Amino acid sequence: MRGQPSIKHLDDVPAEEMLRYEFADGHTASIWEKWIELSPRYVAFWNKWDPGAVSPRHGHVGDHSNLILAGELRCGDIVARAGTHIMLEWGDVFGPWEAGPHGCELYGFIAGEGQPFSGDTAAYEALLKSRGARSVPLPMPKHLPPWMLAKLGGDFTSSVTQWSSST
């Protein structure tokens, strides 16, 4: 317990590049994240998806809530536009998601440590192939707290992220 509220403005929170995709035509699309609050008990975050950015089928350790603030995300026939709420309980997976033509912004909250885990990768790989895209490795985010760095170790590469301390 802090004994008082934690109040932060989004402009005061640094953005981290979570995922980047390179497309056959040479353009890139990324997913950017701001960790508003990050603790072993919960994660509050904001995402900005560039148009066409994708996220693999995955879940997180903890119940997970997303609210689409602007733009849209698509998963097959599902279109989650601004105002859409997505709720996943611990163990649920979702995706692959693809940002719409204007990208997407969302607010998310995970009640738990938030570590991602992979779902079935076949649909994600098929989506990347159909878009002429590939995921590229990124440096480990700079603003991870010590408890998370200790848990992840030097590199954290999965079908969800490709972070490396040597990139």
Question: What are these language model-derived features?
Answer:
Residues 45-49, 68-71, 106-109:
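Short, well-ordered beta-strand segments in beta-rich or mixed alpha/beta enzyme
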Residues 1-41, 124, 133-167:
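A short, N-terminal "cap"/entry segment at the start of jelly-roll beta-barrel domains
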Residues 79-81, 90-120:
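Ligand-binding loop in jelly-roll beta-barrel domains
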Residues 26-32, 37-59, 89-93:
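Conserved short histidine dyad/triad with adjacent acidic residue
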Residues 51, 60-75, 82:
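Glycine- and acidic-residue-biased ligand/ion/polar-headgroup-sensing regions
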Residues 32, 64, 102:
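Residues that flank catalytic or metal-binding motifs in active/ligand-binding sites
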